[in-house]
From Swiss-Prot:
GO terms for cellular component: plasma membrane. It is found in: Cell inner membrane. Its main location: membrane. The chain crosses the membrane at residues 7-31. The gene is djlA. Residues 207-273 form the J domain. Regulatory DnaK co-chaperone. Direct interaction between DnaK and DjlA is needed for the induction of the wcaABCDE operon, involved in the synthesis of a colanic acid polysaccharide capsule, possibly through activation of the RcsB/RcsC phosphotransfer signaling pathway. The colanic acid capsule may help the bacterium survive conditions outside the host. It comes from Photorhabdus laumondii subsp. laumondii (strain DSM 15139 / CIP 105565 / TT01) (Photorhabdus luminescens subsp. laumondii). Signal peptide: none annotated. Residues 1-6 are periplasmic. The transmembrane domain is a dimerization domain. This is Co-chaperone protein DjlA. Homodimer. It holds the Pfam family DnaJ.
């Protein structure tokens, strides 16, 4: 409800001692403040919706570009992209839009750097959104169980254009590798015979520490701090409010579950609550 401006204007008019006209002027000023507030909120939602649309299209365009970087796009690549869309629960028009964006990214003249620069401008001041974008691309690159040298090169370009240092990128890469045993984009691995099965080896303490970006020798305070920071950065509702498309909320939830599972394993192995 947008009446706080009028209420404050009324109070100002009364306490000003200017009588009837003081109250009228106060109400008028308050009315203008309320209108400005409404326009500001409309602008926020319009900008946020635009940011979500750009994030959505850029995600699948860049994903298609990464896939194409290996050379020919195989049926397996397309199937893996479809599986990722299933994880996002994309159906109907949303799925058609994702498929079209994926095809655009495969084009030889796809403007990768300009696309990333537009995304970075749209996500200015929202580092957790940028991080989520990179994590989704890492999941896509790792979806077949391996990272092709050309995929790594494209990922370096992505990190560079999004303002992520090489050291930060390597940390994200290690966290992604550790998270694969926690169902974080790597629950299913391709074998040479073309089938898919769950990784036989269960997650280890080393894997869990990679997910949280900590060392096995770190104390409980350091580990808890890293856990809380990551959970805050991957909170689905917060990410959507900042511009993550609602269709991608499921990936954020799965990432948060992976972080939680890793933290629970560390607590169990190191014996703290």
């Amino acid at each position: 409800m947008h009446y706080w401006g009028k209420l404050l204007g009324l109070i100002f008019g009364v306490v000003s001692g200017a009588g009837f006209w003081g109250i009228v002027i106060g109400l008028f000023i308050g009315h203008m403040l309320d209108r400005a507030s409404v326009r500001g909120n409309q602008g926020f939602f319009a900008n946020n919706q635009s940011r979500q649309l750009l994030f959505f299209s850029s995600t699948f365009q860049v994903m298609g570009h990464i896939t194409k970087s290996k050379g020919r796009v195989t049926e397996t690549d397309i199937r893996l992209a479809s599986q990722l869309m299933e994880r996002m629960q994309l159906h109907g028009q949303a799925r058609i839009a994702a498929q079209q964006a994926f095809r655009e990214g495969k084009e030889p003249n796809f403007p990768l750097r300009e696309t990333l620069r537009q995304l970075r401008r749209a996500c200015f001041g929202r580092s957790d959104l940028i991080r989520m974008f990179l994590e989704i691309q890492l999941q896509a690159a790792f979806s077949d169980g391996q990272l092709h040298p050309n995929e790594r090169t494209v990922l370096f370009i992505i990190a560079d254009e999004l303002g992520i240092s090489r050291n930060q990128f390597e940390q994200f890469l290690a966290m992604m590798e550790g998270g694969r045993n926690f169902g974080d984009g790597g629950e299913w691995q391709q074998r040479q015979y073309g089938g898919y099965q769950k990784a036989a080896q269960g997650p280890t303490l080393a894997d869990a520490c990679k997910v949280l970006g900590v060392r096995e020798k770190d104390d409980a305070t350091t580990i808890k701090r890293a856990y809380r920071r990551l959970m805050s950065e991957h909170h689905p509702d917060k990410l959507v409010a900042k511009g993550l498309p609602p269709e991608m909320m499921e990936i954020a939830k799965q990432k948060a579950q992976s972080i939680q599972a890793a933290y629970d394993l560390i607590k169990k192995e190191k014996g703290f609550k």
